[in-house]
């Protein structure tokens, strides 16, 4: 069941759902709006191949702290960004992340993203550029997070490799290799 603004406020008031900072316009009719943080990472323009079975991306990402001047997302560029807000999900809520329609109308896109029950941290989002450069700014509301209650609290809440992340978190490889299946 998707939570209404009333239900969301109850979760927040009871400190079952943490959103920090929480602004007056965060809670919406059927979800919460989250803002750009001040960190953006783009992939360097290189011809080297990133091997997802063994390579990290530290050597192919350029990360920036952005202030009032904003950040330009180039045409069809893939960037990583983060939410300003730190969130903590209870064991009976999941989040369905959507780009706010204003940013979609500029041609930006995010892939489907789910926030698992029990997740704690800033949310790192993959953002794909439009056909024209688009400038965005820290503090702008850019995501709409729909909250859905599970039929019961999950047996195994999220404890994965992105638990507790702060700021942009690049991909982390699994310990097991897909080459050995």
From Swiss-Prot:
**Protein name per Swiss-Prot or TrEMBL:** dCTP deaminase
- Gene Ontology MF terms in the entry: dCTP deaminase activity; nucleotide binding
**Region described as Disordered: spans on this chain:** 160-181
The UniProt record lists the EC number as: 3.5.4.13
* Species for this entry: Desulfurococcus amylolyticus (strain DSM 18924 / JCM 16383 / VKM B-2413 / 1221n)
Respond yes or no to whether keyword Nucleotide-binding is given for this record: yes
Functionally, this protein is described as follows: Catalyzes the deamination of dCTP to dUTP.
Which reaction equations make up its catalytic activity?
dCTP + H2O + H(+) = dUTP + NH4(+)
Q: Which domain of life is it from?
A: Archaea
Check the UniProt entry and state the signal peptide residues, or none.
Answer: none
> What pathway annotation does it carry?
Pyrimidine metabolism; dUMP biosynthesis; dUMP from dCTP (dUTP route): step 1/2
Question: Entry's PANTHER family?
Answer: DCTP DEAMINASE
Task: Give the record's keywords alphabetically.
Answer: Hydrolase, Nucleotide metabolism, Nucleotide-binding
Active site, per annotation: 126 (proton donor/acceptor)
Q: GO biological process annotations for this chain's record? A: dUMP biosynthetic process; dUTP biosynthetic process
Asked if Ion transport is a keyword of the record, the answer is: no
Question: Which EC main class describes this enzyme?
Answer: hydrolase
Q: Which family does it belong to?
A: Belongs to the dCTP deaminase family.
Entry binding sites for dCTP: 100-105, 116, 158, 165
Q: Quaternary structure per UniProt?
A: Homotrimer.
